[in-house]
Amino acid sequence: MEAPKMELKSYKRKNASLSPSSSPAKAQRTHLSLEEKIKLMRLVVRHKHELVDRKTSEFYAKIARIGYEDEGLAIHTESACRNQIISIMRVYEQRLAHRQPGMKTTPEEDELDQLCDEWKARLSELQQYREKFLVGKRKCDCNDEINERLKKLTEEQQNVDMLVAKVNFLSKHLHDNEEKLMQVNAKMDEVLAENKRLQQLLDHNDLLSKLEPPSAYAPHGVNMGTNMGANMGANMNAIRGGLHSSISPNLGDH
């Protein structure tokens, strides 16, 4: 596993010399001997717990300073130290990939491999921490999103409940109005039936008035006597009684 892949964020390289003098006593080299690599990895493993997330630049700068001042290593910048460790770990991964059972190694190579094993384990711990942190953060973000959606759903449900209540209220009033309309229609039918009955009675009375012959009993002159008037009154009553009895059987035809 390559060390750069374990880092969460790339940092700006700090190439300024850690030595207070403009020309350091030991020139910086890009290639270290096996002994120098072991010294460097010893420092890395010794301070491995000081490497924390988002502080890798500070860690490599400290290792470079200690290696340069205490161990005499020809590295005195953060970027040079980082690159040397990355190179050592890359070669270590290649050796692991091509290692065969029973392959002979020197004690120095074994020590370097052991130091690389410890450093790789530390990087794995940091990777697990980062993944756990990121997963936890994603869960928090998801929880916030879920809570926001639940809030919106609750508001929408309340609006739906209000609409349902209004529909039920209007439906009840519509039903009441339908019942009232049916009652009004029934009353109208009764009124129409009564009007029809009254119209029949009016037609009946009108027919009776048309069937009475007043000319047969009317006075023939202006000098008619009082006896004739009295007789005509009595006769008219008798005739009307007879007419009513004779006309009534024929009313059914009308």
Swiss-Prot record:
GO terms for biological process: chromosome segregation; gene conversion at mating-type locus; mitotic pre-replicative complex assembly; replication fork arrest at rDNA repeats; site-specific DNA replication termination. The keyword Nucleus applies. One of its GO terms (molecular function) is sequence-specific DNA binding. The modification Phosphoserine is found at S17, S19. Sequence repeats lie at residues 221-224, 225-228, 229-232, 233-236. Residues 16-25 have a biased composition (Low complexity). Keywords: Chromosome partition, DNA-binding, Nucleus, Phosphoprotein, Repeat. Residues 1-30 are annotated as: Disordered. Residues 1-10 have a biased composition (Basic and acidic residues). Residues 221-236 are annotated as: 4 X 4 AA tandem repeats of G-[ATV]-N-M. One of its GO terms (cellular component) is chromatin. It is found in: Nucleus. Pfam families: Sap1_N. Binds to sequences required for mating-type switching. Makes a simultaneous contact with both the alpha and beta domains of the switch-activating site SAS1. Also binds to replication fork barrier 1 (RFB1) located within a 78 base pair sequence near the 3' end of the rRNA coding region. This leads to replication fork blockage. It binds the consensus sequence 5'-TA[AG]GCAGNTN[CT]AACG[AC]G-3'. Homodimer. The N-terminus may contain the DNA-binding domain. Last 40 residues of the C-terminus are required for chromosome segregation. This is Switch-activating protein 1.
